[in-house]
Amino acid sequence: MCFATRRWFYLHLGCMMLINLVNADFEFQKGVLASISPGITKDIDLQCWKACSLTLIDLKELKIEHNVDAFWNFMLFLQKSQRPGHYNVFLNIAQDFWDMYVDCLLSRSHGMGRRQVMPPKYNFPQKITGGNLNVYLRE
């Protein structure tokens, strides 16, 4: 008898959980994704953050001001929008940003990015090919 009542209880519990899942408010999840822990902000590499933000404005050809604040205000607008298409665009841009940001951090930590950030010590000629001529320029 105990087995039957336990089974009946779990059946009701499972049905209630399914009903709650169907009626769930996913706006709460958007709010959780938007919150940034204060401890995380000091760990952000601002140079990579700014470079990736500005690069995404150019790559995605966004019709916003060409600065970091405008980009992130636009991202917040997309995230908090009630239109599902806006949230999908937000997720795509956020994924692209994250990929670029991680690549930037890895290249800087391995020294590849430092070569671009620091001023050049030596002035090596760069080869520019134009037609059949090979021209060497010093910048």
Curated annotation (Swiss-Prot):
Mod. after translation: The active form requires C-terminal amidation and disulfide bond formation.
Subcellular location, principal: secreted
Top-level taxon: Eukaryota
Positions annotated as propeptide: 113-139
Cleaved signal peptide residues: 1-24
Cellular component, GO annotation: extracellular region
UniProtKB keywords: Amidation, Secreted, Signal
Function of the molecule: May be capable of activating GPR83 via the GNAQ signaling pathway.
Protein name: Protein FAM237B
